[in-house]
Design a protein with these regions (language model features):
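STAS-like cytosolic regulatory interaction modules
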Residues: 1-35, 42, 54-116
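Residues at alpha-helix caps and immediate loop-helix transition turns in enzyme cores, especially N-
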Residues: 16, 48-49
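Acidic, metal-coordinating catalytic cores used for nucleic-acid/nucleotide bond scission
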Residues: 40-48
Length: 116
């Protein structure tokens, strides 16, 4: 089990996600299931969940992700935020390759517009 609060204090930012990903990857590399204990974590964003956790839906596929990952001790806000991220990841995974390329192009253009 990975006690998330041993590595980060919030589940909020890209930095939080970047700090947790190597811990998750190490667990996956041992072919173990990933149990993430969020006790003590109070702040959550979909940005965090997208980049730290539900990205594995895209690499493993929804069924394998469901077998491998378990999140425990999430607050109600944390659970709702995670479920939103998970739903989006599952929907994105189901897109055909052509639709996925179009979505990636739209996202890229939107990011460029927002950053300039």
């Amino acid at each position: 089990m990975i006690k998330v609060s041993n590595y980060i204090q919030t589940a909020f930012s890209m930095e939080d996600a970047a700090a947790l990903v190597p811990i998750i990857d190490a667990k996956l590399n041992t072919n173990s299931n990933v149990v993430l204990d969020f006790s003590g974590i109070k702040f959550f964003t979909t940005l965090f969940f997208n980049n730290a956790i539900t990205k594995y839906v895209l690499s493993l596929g929804p069924e394998e992700y469901k077998k491998k990952f378990k999140l425990i001790n999430l607050s109600e806000v944390g659970r709702t935020t995670y479920e939103h991220s998970l739903t989006n990841a599952n929907s994105y995974y189901e897109l055909s390759d052509d639709k996925r390329k179009i979505e990636e192009m739209i996202i890229s253009e939107t990011l460029e517009d927002n950053l300039n």
